[in-house]
């Protein structure tokens, strides 16, 4: 699990709101999921995050062997394109939290806007989830300012 903070409105050209800050607590991360042929940039702004890359998902938990694994650290970026790195898992294995900023968008020629991320569920079917927000950036800022 992680905290997902969005900035701006849903524009219809990405799965969910296109500008996202994610805060990854220690020993927390995402499930293996697919980004539906979008482009993305992931920028690490604090800590480090392990990223495992997988082939496109199938309804078979035995197909979850990663094909590549690397760690992105503060100041480093990685990317996703329709043909590269679409299916991945992010995990914070460091002794501190990690924070990332992501930007998502479908390509100009892509007219199919899939609003979901796909993942393999516990019953071995391909399921989908809508990438929701835990807070908008302004809501998070307001709550922080009220406390401090």
Region roles according to the model:
Residues 1-26:
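A short glycine-rich, His/Asp/Glu-containing loop-to-beta-strand
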Residues 20-35, 71-74, 81-85:
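Conserved short histidine dyad/triad with adjacent acidic residue
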Residues 26, 37-55:
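Glycine- and acidic-residue-biased ligand/ion/polar-headgroup-sensing regions
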Residues 41, 53-88, 125-130:
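Short acidic-glycine-tyrosine-enriched beta hairpin
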Residues 41-43, 95-110:
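A short hydrophobic beta-strand segment most commonly corresponding to one strand
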Residues 89-94:
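Asparagine-centered strand-capping/turn motif at beta-strand->loop junctions
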Residues 120-148:
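Long hydrophobic alpha-helical segments typical of transmembrane helices together
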């Amino acid at each position: 699990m992680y905290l997902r903070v969005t900035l701006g409105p849903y524009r219809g050209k990405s799965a969910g709101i296109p500008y996202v800050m994610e805060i990854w607590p220690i020993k927390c991360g995402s499930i293996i999921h697919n980004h539906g042929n979008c482009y993305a940039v992931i920028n690490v702004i604090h800590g480090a995050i392990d990223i495992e890359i997988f082939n496109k998902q199938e309804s078979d938990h035995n197909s979850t062997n990663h094909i590549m694994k690397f760690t992105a650290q503060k100041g480093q970026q990685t990317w996703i394109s329709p043909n590269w790195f679409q299916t991945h898992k992010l995990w914070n294995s460091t002794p501190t939290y990690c924070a990332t900023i992501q930007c998502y968008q479908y390509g100009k020629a892509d007219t199919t806007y899939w609003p979901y991320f796909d993942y393999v569920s516990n019953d071995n079917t391909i399921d989908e989830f809508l990438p929701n927000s835990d807070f908008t950036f302004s809501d998070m800022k307001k709550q922080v300012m009220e406390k401090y």
